[in-house]
């Protein structure tokens, strides 16, 4: 069986560990083959991916799911990475999402996509040391998802009534264990005033998407806490955001733990100016850089059944 899952951008300003948006910029492919066996055995294959089960988000999530249902099988798991890792695009989450979605289909577990999030998020332990559900939820469910509870996990898809595209500015800045490092930079204590400001941003963002109000979304795509604390990881961001707003983007934010910047644009935005000048900012910082123009995507899907 072949299953695919799309990339995603998490946080979206003030929605740290709450919001993530699935988009069609990139996709991961999982090929999974299962045979009857007296014991559970998983073999990982793929170029440029960890082959150890406990170091690979897809195999780690798959193992958690199969153990929970006491499934014994010989599994061959081939991972074809289309989503670049370490750039804030939900790479590890997409692989984990595709793996558990495939297992659910093969073993006819009849679990909902929401139920699968509980297992897919465990795969993030392999990549970042903590089981955060935002990216995996987006890749599994599709669209914009909000994490409403973490134990037990509850996620809901947020209605999107605004037409937009996402310009992803992708600098090739490689930081060892970046997601783990970025999570360690999150402040343990914050001023109440900053908390209130962020809560207002998050409310504005959600209302903007639901009501189709670009000005509310623009206000909501801000953050006074996490992005500020992590700014040393992506010094290019403030200038790119400034340029984006100058040329009437809906808004801009750091995609996940960065360094990718997500710029939300529509028919009012000067996309060419935004793109050209944003790429120039990356060059000024000495970064090799590329871009993608993406649309909101659906969740994981089966491409081929064997």
Curated annotation (Swiss-Prot):
InterPro entries noted in UniProt: GHMP_kinase_C_dom, GHMP_kinase_C_sf, GHMP_kinase_N_dom, GHMP_knse_ATP-bd_CS, Homoserine_kinase, Ribosomal_Su5_D2-typ_SF, Ribsml_uS5_D2-typ_fold_subgr
Family: Belongs to the GHMP kinase family. Homoserine kinase subfamily.
Places the protein is found: Cytoplasm
EC class of the enzyme, as a word: transferase
SUPFAM superfamilies, sorted: GHMP Kinase, C-terminal domain, Ribosomal protein S5 domain 2-like
Recorded name of the encoding gene: thrB
Full protein name: Homoserine kinase
Amino acids binding ATP: 84-94
Organism: Sulfurisphaera tokodaii (strain DSM 16993 / JCM 10545 / NBRC 100140 / 7)
Gene Ontology biological process terms in this record: threonine biosynthetic process
GO molecular function: ATP binding; homoserine kinase activity
Pathways involved: Amino-acid biosynthesis; L-threonine biosynthesis; L-threonine from L-aspartate: step 4/5
Residues that span the membrane, as ranges: none
Primary localization: cytoplasm
Pfam families in alphabetical order: GHMP_kinases_C (PF08544), GHMP_kinases_N (PF00288)
Function: Catalyzes the ATP-dependent phosphorylation of L-homoserine to L-homoserine phosphate.
Catalytic activity annotation: L-homoserine + ATP = O-phospho-L-homoserine + ADP + H(+)
Annotated GO CC locations: cytoplasm
